[in-house]
Amino acid sequence: MCSTCANVLKYYDWDPHFRLIINPNKFLPIGFCDNPLMCCYPDLLPEFGTVWDCDQSPLQIYLESILGDDEWASTHEAIDPSVPPMHWDSAGKIFQPHPGVLMHHLIGEVAKAWDPNLPLFRLEADDGSITTPEQGTAVGGVIAEPSAQMSTAADMASGKSVDSEWEAFFSFHTSVNWSTSETQGKILFKQSLGPLLNPYLEHLSKLYVAWSGSIEVRFSISGSGVFGGKLAAIVVPPGVDPVQSTSMLQYPHVLFDARQVEPVIFTIPDLRSTLYHVMSDTDTTSLVIMVYNDLINPYANDSNSSGCIVTVETKPGPDFKFHLLKPPGSVLTHGSIPSDLIPKSSSLWIGNRYWTDITDFVIRPFVFQANRHFDFNQETAGWSTPRFRPITITISEKNGSKLGIGVATDYIIPGIPDGWPDTTIADKLIPAGDYSITTGEGNDIKTAQAYDTAAVVKNTTNFRGMYICGSLQRAWGDKKISNTAFITTAIRDGNEIKPSNTIDMTKLAVYQDTHVEQEVQTSDDTLALLGYTGIGEEAIGSNRDRVVRISVLPEAGARGGNHPIFYKNSIKLGYVIRSIDVFNSQILHTSRQLSLNHYLLPPDSFAVYRIIDSNGSWFDIGIDSEGFSFVGVSDIGKLEFPLSASYMGIQLAKIRLASNIRSRMTKL
């Protein structure tokens, strides 16, 4: 031991006859370099400890170690560090490691005596008939093997993530329907390589900025031996958009049979030109499952189709790693996973057009709505926030007028009140009088029986098609009680209002007795939307020509055999004790989440949720990047509420959404 080391140890009241030796390079094991902290990564040395030259005086080293302690900075009391300096032979230096670094290294050395396979061992089943992680037919030869060199380079650049037991077993990702109606070339499954493929990777991805490596995918077919047919698993390189054509078979692919008993395992390789991918990178290798030969069931008939279910499970490949730890609270700019757009219980579902509970789904050729409808860019073509609260306006009228134009006082679009309803009247009206509801023969309807048994209900009310609002109407000098208000979007022409499916500040028609006399009176009006006067009309929001927009009306049609849906609820009618259906383009929670958060969803994909009713019937709802919802069946039928919803992942929009609900078939 050199004299300097011995003297330094005396200052620490340490026996200098003990030769304390350390090599901090062991804290940073790098395979290609024996001395990384002095050669390749000298900038990392301060993270592991403090270095002094042997020619420094013992007193100087002792004082600097005290002054560098956090306790000294706060109390100015000299505290001897818990770890004394040690001799770094190969460098000719004195090195004092940080206590936590030294303890971590010592525990790691002790842990080398443990069984290294113990933390990775997990038994999925003790029944030999049940598939365990090691079972399944691994398919190789046509797929690129993981690059060990790229993995090592990515580790050196950013640090390696911690190994865990979830790396050793397959986890459920999604399930895909394969029916006898699917023809050759039909894409059943397409997924780009990334953390979204695995639930554990998806969870851990929130802690990191980047990733790299392959993912293993296991497919299991739940059909029976009576089926015949083949699927092709195709590895599509980055930058190529899969098309539904057998031309895709020109890419590397393997085939597996519908009668395959053993699960089939594929590896999606990470083909990249950089050390790692950021979380927003979706231009990665894709795995596509395509129909190679049609599925055949000899016991099926012409009136319906049958099929089987392909279950998709995943686990990270041996080279998969996360990189660049993200501090808590940091927000990435690329967007988050759309896993919270639909509440788990239907008891929390209300419409974005009206605030009552969702009671059904309505499949239509086209779905359209502007107000309170949001897309994945956090944008809306409407004028309302995704919440329901009273509408606030002012009205100025004179000469006893009961018809006026409101002036917005709370808005996000200047001149249009937040929450103003988004349908117009059917034809020209002169609002006046009371309700007028008769049968087709002109008989007045006064009872529920007369209303329910009438073949035709004629609504000749002079304010039909307007919304009924509870009102808090205030004006200086007016001490009378507030009256019910009727509102709509329309063009005022004297005492007449005309339909208008575009809205601006001049079309906020309000029919209300605000106790106006001859002089101008300005009232402050707070309106709560409660009902509708369109007795005998079609559902609110079902007629495109009556749906109001500022300029553009967002609209969706069928995509890849999937049909757009409205979420149905109801609003109370005026006079008759009945309700009318309301069609909503989104659940209000979906609108709110899309307005507040930026989600990551490609334009050609769905965020898929599985809806299950109380009897076990289920179907998938896919939400596209425009915010519209789709289902893969033409008729949902009657569901037993309450329903539950669970996020299933991202699916290509051109693939039919799965369900166990059989569509109604008619044979001519």
Curated annotation (Swiss-Prot):
- Site feature: Interaction with host receptor F11R/JAM-1: N459, N462
Q: How does it assemble?
A: Homodimer. Homomultimer. Interacts with the minor capsid protein VP2. May bind to VP3 and Vpg proteins. Binds to alpha-2,6-linked sialic acid at surface of target cells. Interacts with host F11R/JAM-1/JAM-A; this interaction allows viral binding and entry into the host cell.
Under the heading InterPro entries, the entry gives:
Calicivirus_coat (IPR004005), Rhv-like (IPR033703), Viral_coat (IPR029053)
Q: What else is known?
A: Mostly expressed from a sgRNA. Expression from the g-RNA is low and occurs at a downstream start codon generating a smaller, truncated LC-VP1 (tLC-VP1) protein.
Q: Which Pfam families match?
A: Calici_coat (PF00915)
Q: What's the name of the protein?
A: Capsid protein VP1
| Annotated function | Capsid protein self assembles to form an icosahedral capsid with a T=3 symmetry, about 38 nm in diameter, and consisting of 180 capsid proteins. A smaller form of capsid with a diameter of 23 nm might be capsid proteins assembled as icosahedron with T=1 symmetry. The capsid encapsulates the genomic RNA and is decorated with VP2 proteins. Attaches virion to target cells by binding to feline junctional adhesion molecule A (F11R) and/or to alpha-2,6-linked sialic acid. Once attached, the virion is endocytosed.
Q: Does the keyword Repeat apply?
A: no
Record site: Cleavage: E124, A125
For this UniProt record, the keywords arranged alphabetically read as follows:
Capsid protein, Disulfide bond, Host cytoplasm, T=3 icosahedral capsid protein, Virion
